[in-house]
Amino acid sequence: MSKEYIGTDCYNRKMELYHIGNEVYCNHIKNGVVVKTNSITVDNRVLGLFGSPHTSGAYIYDEIARMYGKKL
């Protein structure tokens, strides 16, 4: 499991995206401590994006928001 840095949120917290099975998680990190974790169950279309060499975590985050209507 590798965590991918995808940017900062509106509260200036680092965001990391990763998955375990069909569950995608997004950690929000402030001062080195995870302060919030959101998750969503996704299908294989999204999981396939994690293995793509030219696909960024930010793109995956946006695709999840578009497909499922939920921001992590």
Positions of predicted regions on the chain:
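Intrinsically disordered, low-complexity serine/threonine-rich segments
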Residues: 1, 27, 59-62
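Mixed-charge, Lys/Arg-enriched low-complexity segments
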Residues: 34-72
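Short, Lys/Arg-enriched, disordered terminal segments
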Residues: 1-4, 72
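Amphipathic, interaction-prone secondary-structure segments
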Residues: 4-29
